[in-house]
Structures are given as C-alpha cells and as structure tokens.
Amino acid sequence: MLTKKEQRLRRARQTRIRIAQQGVARLSVNRTNLHIYASVVSEDGTKVLASASTAEAEVRTQLGAIGKGGNVAAATLIGKRIAEKAKAAGVEKVAFDRAGFAYHGRVKALAEAAREAGLQF
C-alpha cells in the first residue's frame, strides 16, 4: 500500500506525462507549510521561463500586512505575480500542474488569481 506522499508523487508524475503530450508550457505549483512556489516551465521541460514564490524578499515585504506565506492571501499574490511574469516572457497559455496536491485552498487560490491576471488554462 502506498503512503499518502507516494500517492501524491505518483499523481504528479502521471500529470507531467499528460502535460508533456499536450505541447504547452506548464504552470507548476509546489506548496509547503510556510511557502508556496510557482514556476512556468517550457514545453519540453528544459527551461524555467518564469517563477514566483513567497520566499522572495520582495514578496515577503508585501506580505508584511498579510502575514506568513502559507495562507490563501499569499497564494493569491503569487498567482498574480506568476501570471505577470509569464506574460512578460511571452507565455499566454499553460497547462496547470498541481503536483498531485488537491485543487483546494492555496492551490485553488493561486490558480484562480493566475486566471484572473490573464493566463489561460
């Protein structure tokens, strides 16, 4: 029987395979208890085109009023930032890779903020 972490990693691997077959850039999300990370990876998976996280110094100063980086408000901020950076890099359409995490809470907030800021997925 697989542990919860092994199940999540298996789902993530299967998702990456499906996204690679689509031939579009991938918006990859990873979350920890303290931070949330997002990056836009090229179609072939070799280059990171844009990235944003709550661990960045500039973001931490913006989060001063909100609190730590492990909440929905911080995920919303990262969603907007990654969409702006992706559009600056010339990426409009992506496939959402939630890395096996449930589409709920911080992951959902990041995705919705990125959509509102102009990314299509």
Swiss-Prot record:
Quaternary structure, from the entry: Part of the 50S ribosomal subunit; part of the 5S rRNA/L5/L18/L25 subcomplex. Contacts the 5S and 23S rRNAs.
CC terms in the record's Gene Ontology section: cytosolic large ribosomal subunit
Name this polypeptide is given: Large ribosomal subunit protein uL18
GO biological process, one term: translation
UniProt cross-references to InterPro entries, sorted A to Z: Ribosomal_uL18_bac-type, Ribosomal_uL18_bac/euk
Function: This is one of the proteins that bind and probably mediate the attachment of the 5S RNA into the large ribosomal subunit, where it forms part of the central protuberance.
Primary gene name: rplR
GO MF annotations in UniProt: 5S rRNA binding; structural constituent of ribosome
Keyword RNA-binding: yes
PANTHER family named among the record's database cross-references: 39S RIBOSOMAL PROTEIN L18, MITOCHONDRIAL, LARGE RIBOSOMAL SUBUNIT PROTEIN UL18M
NCBIfam families hit by this protein: L18_bact
UniProt similarity note: Belongs to the universal ribosomal protein uL18 family.
Entry superkingdom: Bacteria
Keyword line: Ribonucleoprotein, Ribosomal protein, RNA-binding, rRNA-binding
Pfam families linked to this entry: Ribosomal_L18p
Entry-linked Gene3D superfamilies: 3.30.420.100
